[in-house]
Amino acid sequence: MKRDKRLEIIKEIVTNNKISTQEELQSLLLERGVEVTQATLSRDIRKLNIIKKRDKGESFYSFLTSGNSKINSDLQLYFYNFVISAKSVGALVVIRTKLGEADVLANALDDERDSRTDILGTIAGADTLLVICASEKAANILTAEIKYILLG
């Protein structure tokens, strides 16, 4: 089966079912005649921007939605998976991350500077990232975008 067709089937399954595990998704794919390895399924999940959401003690797969965010989908996944909190202070944004992930996020944000003139630079520690923005307004917008992503 071609990849595009498989991706369409995965979209349909995730949209219409509460899937908790990759094994469950793999089983539903098999019921539809789609045999896929766990590694391929993981790549497909990443490609489709599918994330695990938590609600009332349950976790299930859902699509990452960006709204009007200027943050690209790869960076959204980094934010969703690694960020604990974000707060703006003047033209700065202080982002708390999981331990060891601040520098990964800083590199990803630095890569965005060509397309985002509102981000001037970053400084990362082990679990804290400081983003220097062009203005207080830019810092507030970036913080709002991050918080929107974290809410899922």
UniProtKB/Swiss-Prot annotation:
Give the stretches traversing the membrane: none
GO cellular component terms, semicolon-separated? cytoplasm
Principal subcellular localisation of the protein? cytoplasm
Annotated metabolic or biological route of this protein: Amino-acid biosynthesis; L-arginine biosynthesis [regulation]
Task: Supply the SUPFAM superfamilies for this chain.
Answer: C-terminal domain of arginine repressor, Winged helix' DNA-binding domain
Where does this polypeptide localize? Cytoplasm
Q: Name one GO biological process term.
A: regulation of arginine biosynthetic process
Named from the GO MF annotations, one term is: DNA binding
* Transmembrane helix is among the record's keywords: no
- InterPro entries the record matches: Arg_repress, Arg_repress_C, Arg_repress_C_sf, Arg_repress_DNA-bd, WH-like_DNA-bd_sf, WH_DNA-bd_sf
Keyword set for this entry? Amino-acid biosynthesis, Arginine biosynthesis, Cytoplasm, DNA-binding, Repressor, Transcription, Transcription regulation
Report if keyword Repressor is assigned: yes
What is known about what this protein does? Answer: Regulates arginine biosynthesis genes.
Cross-referenced NCBIfam families: argR_whole
Family as reported in the entry's similarity comment: Belongs to the ArgR family.
User: Which HAMAP family has this protein been placed in?
Assistant: Arg_repressor
Q: From the Swiss-Prot or TrEMBL record, give the protein name.
A: Arginine repressor
Source species: Lactococcus lactis subsp. lactis (strain IL1403) (Streptococcus lactis)
